[in-house]
A protein has these predicted regions:
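Structured non-transmembrane domains adjacent to transmembrane bundles in polytopic membrane proteins
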Residues: 43-65, 70-171, 382-553, 559-578, ...
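Membrane-embedded transmembrane helical bundles of large multi-pass transporters/channels
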Residues: 1-36, 40, 142-383, 503-735
Length: 735
């Protein structure tokens, strides 16, 4: 099997720890652009996105913020319009603010708000007169860092009890929370990972080595995101996910090294044997996980492309760190690892494995029974598309959105952009029809306030500039329905049909804004989930088939993997919990990666024991005992790391993802141990006929491992955990 060179190990550590690129990577990570606007990942071909781009380019409104100003002081006195105008002017002076629309743009605000025309009053004043509303638009899109800074400046000058709403304000709140909480997530995940490894591993030193190696991999992965930028979701969970994915490979190698150390003359020989013996599980697991993440790149919502590339890159860097850097660290610090060994606090799985093997038909039958229910429950899980709901209740945007609904009878704003060459009389008919659509609370349009008989030449330029630019006209429609709900989607569809009726083929018309964008988000992700699931299944099937040179094994493992994913999502259905819209796609890829790691580890070890001459029952008993230890360590580590983040996280979308990841790690481990173990055993004859080079399958006593005489004489010097011994007999069953 060859040996490692001790000097090469030391050189590897030196290179890993002191490369000039380290500083560049850290600096790149700090300056990586983070996108907080999920809607910006929608395909550019959609009409809602085209309308949003026009709104941004011509009207500076693609990233509108609604400012709610309290007009009644604590003593019940009214705040003068001049005070509100002063605030408006101060907001206008903030960098990147292109326009601020308030009642004074329409008419003289010296007129008391309660005697203004209803059309104006309903748009700019709450029904009880307690709040007034102004619309702030910017010169850049909502995902821009500069806009987030501008929103932060607006917050600083807002009077007490004043709030913000809108996509740009929500992005600002999201940034503040992720910036403050992400370091906490990482610290908690790392701390819990170290504690879990110290409990389940043989040495108190090994967890720190693993975290150090994985830390290097995470640093390089996150630093190389500088060239493409990342979404805040990717930024929040990528490090934790890479920890979970890479730790599987690390644990597989460490446990295999400990096993080979007992039968090798030197530690270098043991490491070479461990790498050779782990090749199938490491290569198969990493390739399937890699293709699972790459499947996300086929999403129309390019958020999938962002997460997919970052995580696929993380898998590659993680595997390289495990096969290059980790062996070097383990060999150099071998004496320290051995000095601080202890008995791991892990259960003895011997009886558990015997129980599963003895009742293999019952466990296999149970697996078949739960396939359909888990699929149905998973298919009916409710998804939450409203990003406002992902923020805490006390966030500025959340409070502002609630006030909009309570005080102004509106929750969502739609923008309609039409060709300005359409006759005014025709536009008025369209506006009246839209105003009568169910759920529309108010509408702001040029002809509704100026009138069709007044020429543009006598209308003030500042009024025209707000609603007319470059041959286009924009209208604002306020809705009582919350974006992403069925009622709001139906409302948007009705408005789109009305606009199409009046614009026809001769003119253009777009409906955009939160409601339209969320509607397209829902329709887009429905297709995305089906496509990515199919692609990932096909890709993983092909990889498993190539790795094992088998037709039957991919079917067995893919079904087990999918059932684990269905159970995870189905639990949310049972408890009536809505999951983030991105969860089915992301969770399926990540849990697929974890489950396939465990499945390939067990299957490859089963094949290896058969090749050594063991009977099928003896081979599975040996394979399961060795594999379950690694599966247990990995599942516990990933569970506690993600569950810890779930407990402290304030952002609902990240919190929900971590909850499902934590739950999924346990489900994946249980599915592999409880169901794949007996199914592989029962199907071994079929597998042997459909797999090239599978090996023997008849039951026979397990041979003793071949131990070199030199190692036998000195084996007592090593402080390894005592292996569980089994006595295998041919029970005569056709297993």
């Amino acid at each position: 099997a060859g040996e490692f060179d001790q000097r090469s190990s030391g050189s590897t550590i030196l290179i890993a720890g002191r490369t000039p690129g380290d500083k560049i990577i850290v600096i790149s990570y700090i300056f990586t652009n983070v996108n907080y606007d999920i809607l910006s990942y929608l395909p550019s071909k959609l009409d809602s996105v085209k309308g949003e781009n026009i709104l941004e380019e011509d009207f500076g409104g693609g990233s509108m913020t609604i400012v709610l100003v309290k007009t009644v002081d604590d003593n019940g006195g009214k705040i003068s319009p001049n005070t509100v105008m002063k605030l408006k002017n101060n907001i206008s002076e903030i960098k990147n603010v292109s326009n601020v629309l308030w009642a004074d743009n329409i008419m003289d605000t010296s007129v008391p708000g309660d005697i203004l025309p209803d059309d104006v009053k309903n748009v700019f004043y709450s029904s009880d007169g307690e709040y007034t509303m102004m619309f702030v638009s910017y010169s850049e899109d909502a995902s821009s860092k500069d806009i987030i800074k501008s929103v932060k400046e607006i917050k600083k000058i807002l009077p007490e009890n004043s709030y913000l709403s809108g996509i740009s304000a929500m992005n600002s709140d999201t940034k503040e929370m992720t910036d403050s909480e992400t370091p906490i997530y990482i610290l908690i995940a790392v701390a819990l990972a170290i504690i879990t490894m110290m409990i389940t591993m043989e040495s108190y030193v090994m967890p720190f080595i693993l975290v150090g190696v994985i830390g290097i991999a995470v640093m390089y992965n996150m630093g190389t995101n500088f060239f493409m930028g990342v979404s805040y979701i990717t930024q929040s969970i990528a490090a934790i996910l890479q920890l979970g994915v890479t730790i599987d490979y690390s644990i597989f190698l460490v446990n295999r090294y400990n096993e080979e150390r007992k039968y090798s003359r030197t530690k270098e020989e043991a490491m070479a044997r461990a790498l050779h013996g782990s090749f199938i599980s490491l290569s198969g697991s990493s390739l399937t996980t890699l293709f699972g993440f790459l499947a996300l790149c086929f999403m129309q919502l390019t958020l999938g492309l962002n997460i997919g590339i970052v995580m696929a890159k993380g898998v590659i860097i993680g595997v390289l760190s495990v096969v290059i850097i980790l062996p070097a660290f383990m060999l150099v610090f071998d004496s320290a690892i051995n000095r601080h060994k202890h008995k791991p606090f892990t259960p003895d799985f011997g009886k558990f494995v015997n129980h599963i093997i003895k009742r293999k038909k019952a466990f296999a039958a149970l697996f078949i029974i739960i396939i359909i229910p888990s699929l149905l429950l998973s298919a009916n899980v409710k998804k939450n598309y409203n990003l406002n709901a992902e923020l805490p209740d006390d966030a500025t945007t959340t409070v502002g959105t609630v006030l909009l609904k309570e005080k102004f009878n509106m929750t969502t704003s739609h923008f309609i952009i039409v060709d300005d060459s359409i006759p005014a009389s025709k536009l008025v008919r369209m506006e009246n029809e839209i105003s009568n659509v169910e759920g529309v609370s108010s509408m702001l349009a040029y002809d509704m306030f100026v009138g069709t008989s007044i020429p543009d030449s006598i209308v003030p330029d500042d009024v025209i500039d707000i609603v007319k630019q470059n041959g286009r006209q924009v209208m604002l429609v306020n809705s009582i329905y919350e974006s992403s709900t069925d009622k709001c989607n139906e409302q948007v569809e009705k408005i789109e049909n009305i606009v199409q009726k009046y614009t026809g083929s001769e003119h253009y018309g777009y409906v955009t804004g939160e409601g339209a964008l969320y509607k397209d988000l829902i329709e887009t992700t429905k297709v995305d989930f089906a496509v990515t699931s199919l692609i990932s299944i096909i890709a993983v099937f092909i990889v498993i088939a190539i790795v094992f040179k088998s037709i039957s094994i991919p079917f067995i493992l893919i079904i087990a993997i999918e059932v684990a994913i269905w159970i995870n999502q189905g639990i949310s259905t049972l408890f009536g919990t809505a999951i983030p819209f991105i969860a089915p796609t992301v969770i399926s890829c990540i849990q697929l990666g974890a489950t396939v790691d465990y499945a390939i580890l067990l299957t490859s070890r089963f094949k290896e024991e058969l090749a050594r001459g063991a009977g099928r029952t003896a081979a599975m008993r040996k394979a399961a005992n060795e594999a379950i230890r690694s599966v247990f360590q990995s599942a516990m580590l990933f569970f506690f790391a993600t569950f810890g983040v779930y407990l402290v996280c304030s952002i609902s979308i990240v919190k929900s993802l971590c909850a499902m990841l934590a739950r999924g790690s346990l489900i994946s481990a249980l599915v592999i141990v409880l169901f794949v173990t007996p199914i592989l055993l029962l199907c071994e004859k079929l597998i042997s006929k459909t797999t090239k080079g599978w090996g023997t399958h008849d039951d026979k006593p397990e041979p003793e491992p071949v131990v070199p005489a030199e190692v036998k004489k000195n084996i007592d010097e090593y402080e390894f955990e005592e292996e569980t011994s089994f006595t295998f007999t041919d029970d005569g069953e056709d297993e």
